[in-house]
């Protein structure tokens, strides 16, 4: 019996071992079962609502039909001035996905700002074509304050 590699458990032989083609085929099956990145790049999609523009989504498609996408949105024209007391909020914004999705199973949003605040995911439960968010702040904002919203989405695409 040949030795095996640590990560995939592939069979390896010394030069004086007898090669068993059944074990070679097992190696190919183990490799074929691995999920690999089949495509990556950048695609654009629009966002609109409280703020509008074009999002550059960086993505990785995988051989099992899953996808990971992320984007960074930068705003100089958003302020948290909605509500009668803290937390104050911005208008809602919808960011479209550049791919048709059959399932979205993970969405993460993060905010970078000069003020104390956070970004709130207000996307509906069964929405598969976009995410919706509001920026929240503890202080009422009279002026526009530069903010960045980072969004990461994981899911399953329609056409593999």
Question: Each PLM stretch: what is its role?
Answer:
Residues 1-36:
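Extracellular "spike/adhesin" assembly and maturation modules
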Residues 6, 21, 40, 48-51, ...:
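Intrinsically disordered, low-complexity regions enriched in Ser/Pro/Gly/Gln/His and often acidic
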Residues 20, 57, 150-152:
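Conserved beta-strand and immediately adjacent loop positions that scaffold enzyme active sites
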Residues 26-70, 160:
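Glycine-rich, low-complexity segments
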Residues 66-160:
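Extracellular attachment/recognition segments
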């Amino acid at each position: 019996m040949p030795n095996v590699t640590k990560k995939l458990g592939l069979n390896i032989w010394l030069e004086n071992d007898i090669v068993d083609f059944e074990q070679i085929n097992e190696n190919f099956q183990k490799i074929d079962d691995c999920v690999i990145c089949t495509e990556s790049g950048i695609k654009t999609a629009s966002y609109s609502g409280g703020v509008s523009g074009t999002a550059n989504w960086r993505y990785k498609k995988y051989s099992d039909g899953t996808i990971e996408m992320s984007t960074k949105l930068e705003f100089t024209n958003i302020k948290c001035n909605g509500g009668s007391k803290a937390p104050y909020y911005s208008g809602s914004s919808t960011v479209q996905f550049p791919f048709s999705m059959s399932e979205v199973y993970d969405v993460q949003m993060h905010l970078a700002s000069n003020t104390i605040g956070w970004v709130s995911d207000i996307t509906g439960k069964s929405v598969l074509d976009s995410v919706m968010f509001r920026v929240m702040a503890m202080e009422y904002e009279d002026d526009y304050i530069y903010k960045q919203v980072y969004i990461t989405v994981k899911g399953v695409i329609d056409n593999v």
